[in-house]
Amino acid sequence: MIYQSPTIQVELLEDNIAKLCFNAQGSVNKFDRETIASLDAALDSIKQNTNIKALLLTSAKSTFIVGADITEFLTLFQQDDATLLAWVEQANAVFNKLEDLPFPTASAINGFALGGGCETILATDLRVADTNARIGLPETKLGLIPGFGGTVRLPRVIGADNALEWITTAKDQRPEDALKVGAIDAVVAPENLEAAAIQMLHDALNGSLDWQARRTKKQSPLQLPKLEAMMSFATAKGMVFSVAGKHYPAPMAAVNVVEQAAGLDRDGALKVEALAFIKLAKTDVAQALIGIFLNDQFVKGKAKKAGKLAKDVNQAAVLGAGIMGGGIAYQSASKGTPIVMKDIAQPALELGLNEAAKILTTQVARGRSTPEKMAKVLNNITPSLDYAAIKNSDIVVEAVVEHPKVKATVLAEVEGYVSEDAIIASNTSTISINLLAKSLKKPERFCGMHFFNPVHKMPLVEIIRGEHSSEETIATVVAYASKMGKTPIVVNDCPGFFVNRVLFPYFAGFSGLLAEGADFAAVDKVMEKQFGWPMGPAYLLDVVGLDTGHHAQAVMAEGFPDRMGKNGKDAIDIMFENKRLGQKNTKGFYAYSVDRRGKPKKDIDPTSYELLSAEFGELKAFESDDIIARCMIPMIIETVRCLEEGIIASPAEGDMGLVYGIGFPPFRGGVFRYLDTMGVANFVALADKYAHLGGLYQVTDAMRALAANNGSYYQA
């Protein structure tokens, strides 16, 4: 053994080829500070051993290296620029040491080689991947750019255009695609991986592979004619801005770094990259996006723990077909759990099956699936008009019309057809789980399971715990949601649960603006372009459906009359009363037509303005900051109330619910991250300016106390 540490072992193979194996103590290899220090020490040992003629990098795990240890980032990025620069330069010195070894080097890539893992293989001369490999630089998803030489070496290996696409889109690449552009040199079966990499090193040693020319190319300025460079970078900037926009600076920073470093050698280019990396690391956007990544891991970790208490779900059922039922059936069947789709009407069953088939057909057309896989998924869905079909189900998801009496009747019927230990869940968005539980003989096996529409696209599922729901019930439904490929958050029962409870104060803030004469299209523009929502409140209400919005608003007003009760009509009432239901009947706040691709296209409709002005008078202009404050303060305060009341268990789950459930702008990180970034004291001072508008704008005593103590919701 040439070198051994808790994360890396180096041994000498035949023909004086050294094998450096990444083998961290956890389930995967990551680049934390310990591993970088171990790699540095291992390379020193390798350099000192004069018998070594070549080096092979491998992994003892099922993946190569998944990237940097993100958990270290938030504390690391709190340090001053000089300390952070020293850390980046120290890490880069290690990668340079690997690249500068006096003999050929190769990487045998199994599974994921992402971020720092990808930068590691780029520092070697030769790269062989197995058929399961995935290679990429995902840093821009975290608001960063690669910091260990990714923007320097990748363009010199695969060309500027390909490298910019890889870096700015942050997508994992399949091995065949990586081979096509020259990022790797061969793709082999997993069982042949190490042998193929060793053979490549032999080819380098005997002169049939010019490893030194490959290395020199990586260490030299980018070979790109001036005119071609101008066109390449101008095109990349245009494409990046159209996709990322102004709120996500990392992709554009990556283009600028590659451009600025194009004429420099490796060491000069690495300095450009390091300075840009540090600048981005200090941004609120990076803090927010890294926070989302860590929150996602936290929520999924909780779901994994719940899995230990969960019962197996081998057969599921959904009651109520149609679009929602079809979406749930598709999601279950596509992830391997057969499901019965039960309804009382054949046309509804056909609609549900058509919904599943439509999703699958689109996937096949886009090359994301095959006709064989489509057939397998559809065969996993059994439509039925008979309750007898659900008798062997381990879980039944009720998804009938959103009406308490109808749901209660259906739930009582279901209990008579399933086994004693089958779990029953209601896909309701507003109806109290405790109320619905009264219709069951065994309420302990019942909870809420709130899917968001469209089911196949929306990652969140709210699992609602009723006062009688058992831990096994909650754990099983959480595990089933995870198995379906969803991110579950567990919330306690209250009107609107979590997501709708905090969404409707936002709509109330919007309605208040319109009642004072604000232009709904102007409000949408500010909330989309400046705050960063994917849709402004008027557009979102049209998409949700103003009938749905009107119903949910009434539920919220009844549940929280002090804050959400209304005096007189608001804009939602006016649209609903005039049968303007949104996209579903082509007219809401906006008018809708179908574009060439068959998608809804919105247009300004004068009738909406006439209806609103008849009630609220002439239009009046509002400042952008005023619009944002009027809409966001109610949502933020209500979200904090949910944490204080125990509706949600943690800021992390609250923020993930908002980002995944209603599209809260990821670059802001969620309400709690937004509050911490803004400063709780600053928010309280802002809210106090609007407190005269009513309870929705009045902060809680606990918020005021936190502000006075200069506290935060996330602990550093």
From Swiss-Prot:
Q: Which residues form the active site?
A: 450
The keyword Transcription is assigned to this record = no
Instruction: Name the chemical reaction catalysed here.
Output: a (3S)-3-hydroxyacyl-CoA + NAD(+) = a 3-oxoacyl-CoA + NADH + H(+); a (3S)-3-hydroxyacyl-CoA = a (2E)-enoyl-CoA + H2O; a 4-saturated-(3S)-3-hydroxyacyl-CoA = a (3E)-enoyl-CoA + H2O; (3S)-3-hydroxybutanoyl-CoA = (3R)-3-hydroxybutanoyl-CoA
- Which key words tag this protein in UniProt? Fatty acid metabolism, Isomerase, Lipid degradation, Lipid metabolism, Lyase, Multifunctional enzyme, NAD, Oxidoreductase
In the Enzyme Commission scheme, what number(s) does this protein have? 4.2.1.17, 5.1.2.3, 5.3.3.8, 1.1.1.35
Q: Which PROSITE patterns match?
A: 3HCDH (PS00067)
Q: Where does substrate bind?
A: 296, 500, 660
Region (Enoyl-CoA hydratase/isomerase) spans which residues? Answer: 1-189
Residues involved in NAD(+) binding = 324, 343, 400-402, 407, 429, 453
Please give one Pfam family short name.
Answer: 3HCDH_N
The pathway noted for it is: Lipid metabolism; fatty acid beta-oxidation
Task: List the InterPro entries hit by this protein, alphabetically.
Answer: 3-OHacyl-CoA_DH_CS, 3-OHacyl-CoA_DH_NAD-bd, 3HC_DH_C, 6-PGluconate_DH-like_C_sf, ClpP/crotonase-like_dom_sf, Enoyl-CoA_hydra/iso, FA_oxidation_alpha_subunit, FadB
In terms of SUPFAM superfamilies, this protein maps to:
6-phosphogluconate dehydrogenase C-terminal domain-like, ClpP/crotonase, NAD(P)-binding Rossmann-fold domains
Site (Important for catalytic activity) residue list:
119, 139
A molecular function annotated in GO for this UniProt entry is:
enoyl-CoA hydratase activity
Give the record's GO CC terms. Answer: fatty acid beta-oxidation multienzyme complex
Q: Which domain of life is it from?
A: Bacteria
GO biological process terms on file: fatty acid beta-oxidation
Q: Where is this region: 3-hydroxyacyl-CoA dehydrogenase?
A: 311-716
| Recorded family membership | In the N-terminal section; belongs to the enoyl-CoA hydratase/isomerase family. In the C-terminal section; belongs to the 3-hydroxyacyl-CoA dehydrogenase family.
Alphabetized PANTHER family for the sequence? TRIFUNCTIONAL ENZYME SUBUNIT ALPHA, TRIFUNCTIONAL ENZYME SUBUNIT ALPHA, MITOCHONDRIAL
**What does the protein in this record do?**
Involved in the aerobic and anaerobic degradation of long-chain fatty acids via beta-oxidation cycle. Catalyzes the formation of 3-oxoacyl-CoA from enoyl-CoA via L-3-hydroxyacyl-CoA. It can also use D-3-hydroxyacyl-CoA and cis-3-enoyl-CoA as substrate.
Q: What is this protein called?
A: Fatty acid oxidation complex subunit alpha
